[in-house]
């Protein structure tokens, strides 16, 4: 019988994490459960830095970006002895189960705790939208708005100077954020990790656009594919057009969550409590066709693959 749960945020922060914490806390309290917040993710779990939360602890949190509990990367959590300390810390505080909000790296920690007999539920919190088993992750839609706004601003100055602009978008090894932002921002060219790319092919496409009369262009590219400053130099050399590179960086993680992220986070937070009360552990929450779903967390990490939105890319190419 679960009487008290813990909640933490782990990995890179994402807008809507506070709304998810709020959803967990208030749904748990409505069921008569106690809630303990863990500071700085798995690091705080290991260092026994926790605080009891009530409904007022999460007042005015639904609209705040970031995570008030904090987050930290803690690779030492792979060590079983470290995890044993974390479990003992939770047990001495009377915590019976844990809700983990984060990406697939955070899920791995939850999986390992579950394998050691401590029930965990994972909520997908990352702007990258790269977690399997869910159509969307908490923070993705807010980051999308941020990226599109940046592209709109770049278009203004690119048009004024008849310039080629390259914008690097987060996403790690998933192109969802780049692809959606490129369509919404009207980008002329898109470079994604899912599609083989050569800079020669990109330059040929840009030259073809110039031949059609394009005065300026925006290239959206997912991070980790190449050095975009070097790419900008190469494009300028080959096209004789001024080319500038912009790395959006961590501004994509900040800001108040948009309405959909607040709703998604609230629904997922409340659903995690339903699952725990039904006796589930080692599960991760997702949304598919606007319905809450749950999967084995091992499947989400190791076996399930996110489908690539090839039809979206086809649409984008028609609009170049």
Swiss-Prot record:
Residues holding substrate: 126-128, 163, 170-172, 223, 244, 250-253
Q: Which residues bind Mg(2+)?
A: 104
BP GO terms, sorted: canonical glycolysis; fructose 1,6-bisphosphate metabolic process; fructose 6-phosphate metabolic process
Q: How is its activity regulated?
A: Allosterically activated by ADP and other diphosphonucleosides, and allosterically inhibited by phosphoenolpyruvate.
Q: Name one GO molecular function term.
A: ATP binding
User: Which residues are the active-site ones?
Assistant: 128
Superkingdom of this entry's organism?
Bacteria
Catalytic activity from the UniProt record: beta-D-fructose 6-phosphate + ATP = beta-D-fructose 1,6-bisphosphate + ADP + H(+)
A Pfam family it matches: PFK
For ATP, which residues are the binding ones? 12, 73-74, 103-106
Record keywords: Cell wall biogenesis/degradation included?
A: no
Q: Which residues form a coiled coil?
A: none
Q: What pathway is it annotated to?
A: Carbohydrate degradation; glycolysis; D-glyceraldehyde 3-phosphate and glycerone phosphate from D-glucose: step 3/4
Q: How does it assemble?
A: Homotetramer.
Task: Supply the name of the protein.
Answer: ATP-dependent 6-phosphofructokinase
Source organism per UniProt:
Erwinia tasmaniensis (strain DSM 17950 / CFBP 7177 / CIP 109463 / NCPPB 4357 / Et1/99)
């Amino acid at each position: 019988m679960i009487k008290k749960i813990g909640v933490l945020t782990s990995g890179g922060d994402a807008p809507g994490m506070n709304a998810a914490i709020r959803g967990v806390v208030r749904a748990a309290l409505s069921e008569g459960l106690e809630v303990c917040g863990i500071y700085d993710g798995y690091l705080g779990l290991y260092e026994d830095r926790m605080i009891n939360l009530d409904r007022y602890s999460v007042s005015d949190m639904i609209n705040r970006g970031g995570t008030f509990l904090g987050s930290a990367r803690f690779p030492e959590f792979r060590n079983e002895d470290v995890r044993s300390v974390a479990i003992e810390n939770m047990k001495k505080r009377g915590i019976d189960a844990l809700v983990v909000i984060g990406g697939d790296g955070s899920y791995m920690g939850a999986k390992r705790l579950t394998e050691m007999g401590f029930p965990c539920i994972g909520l997908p919190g990352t702007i990258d939208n790269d977690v399997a088993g869910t159509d969307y992750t908490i923070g993705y839609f807010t980051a999308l708005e941020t990226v599109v706004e940046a592209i709109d601003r770049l278009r203004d100055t690119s048009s004024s100077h008849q310039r080629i602009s390259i914008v690097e978008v987060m996403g790690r090894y998933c192109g969802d954020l780049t692809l959606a932002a490129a369509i919404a921002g009207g980008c002329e060219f898109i470079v994604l990790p899912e599609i083989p790319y050569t800079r020669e092919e990109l330059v040929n496409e840009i030259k073809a656009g110039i031949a059609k009369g394009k005065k300026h262009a925006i290239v959206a590219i997912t991070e980790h594919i190449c050095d975009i400053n070097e790419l900008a130099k190469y494009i300028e050399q080959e096209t004789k057009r001024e080319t500038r590179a912009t790395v959006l960086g961590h501004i994509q993680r900040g800001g108040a969550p948009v309405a959909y992220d607040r709703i998604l986070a609230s629904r997922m937070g409340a659903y995690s409590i339903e699952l725990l009360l039904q006796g589930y552990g080692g599960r991760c929450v997702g949304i598919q066709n606007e319905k809450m779903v749950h999967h084995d967390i091992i499947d989400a990490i190791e076996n399930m693959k996110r489908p690539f939105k090839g039809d979206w890319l086809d649409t984008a190419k028609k609009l170049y």
